């Protein structure tokens, strides 16, 4: 809660990362080339509700201040994502490169939130489909079977 999170990119993956992180109280900043009106409706709503900060700008290394707890490289350009990952690793910032699992300090889990519990399911980045299937299987269990006894 309260930690700086930077997401570079504003596509499907970036939106998914932000959607999962929002309930946990991080200070999320999204930077991408798109103008605000070009963003997905969900992102525009988060901006209006001041749940995230948005900067419409091209990536440059000055974007990464060094105060970030997590950075997500989620642009549609693998070279830019690689540059972001290298900068973060030099600065000691945890980074997730959506283009290259080898440049990830962590894998983003699939999350199930139920009442006061959060379940994170992560794989080794080789099979996202398997992780998604397991999450769905758990979510489809009757409520009583999902809770510890």
Predicted regions located by residue number:
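ADP-ribose/adenylate-binding Rossmann-like module
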Residues: 70-75, 81-107
């Amino acid at each position: 809660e309260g930690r700086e999170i930077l997401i570079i990119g504003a596509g499907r993956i970036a939106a998914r990362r932000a959607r999962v992180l929002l309930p946990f109280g991080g200070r999320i900043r999204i930077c991408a080339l798109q103008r605000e009106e070009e963003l997905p409706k969900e992102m525009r709503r988060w901006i209006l509700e001041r749940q995230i900060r948005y900067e419409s700008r091209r990536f440059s290394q000055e974007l990464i201040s060094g105060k970030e707890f997590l950075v997500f490289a989620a642009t549609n350009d693998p070279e830019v994502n690689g540059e972001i990952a290298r900068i973060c690793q030099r600065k000691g910032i945890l980074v997730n490169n959506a283009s290259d699992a080898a440049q990830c300090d962590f894998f983003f889990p699939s999350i199930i939130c139920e009442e006061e519990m959060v379940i994170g399911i992560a794989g080794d980045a080789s099979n996202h489909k398997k992780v998604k299937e397991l999450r769905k299987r758990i979510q489809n269990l009757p409520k009583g079977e999902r809770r510890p006894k």
